[in-house]
């Protein structure tokens, strides 16, 4: 068997998230420049989760971004989900977001941009304490996202 005959992975939809965000804290006032770009911190104020698990995104998390250029940002969001049954899931979601100079400038100003104009892909990982949720720690997950003025929409898929 050679590598080209291996089966291609498939994607299974797992959940959708709506993550509400506050006004970004820009690098000049908080962290400053680093070797890769400017630091931007976007507080997470809440949200919803639907799909194979259902619940809410708790306030208190944040997206710790590095703005690499006028067109590209590396994202590192960390937040807690509380499920309807009271269980908790900690999420670390690393992502890449890029678009044209004009479209990224609109996002920064809080203006809407068509989701298809922005490349926004993520790789979330999950920490759980419940054996019933352990499946979230035993697969690779990927997702696609869209940034709106007050929120981020994410669809998450298990790589099968």
Predicted regions and their residues:
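Beta-strand-enriched cores of mature, soluble protein domains
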Residues: 1-160
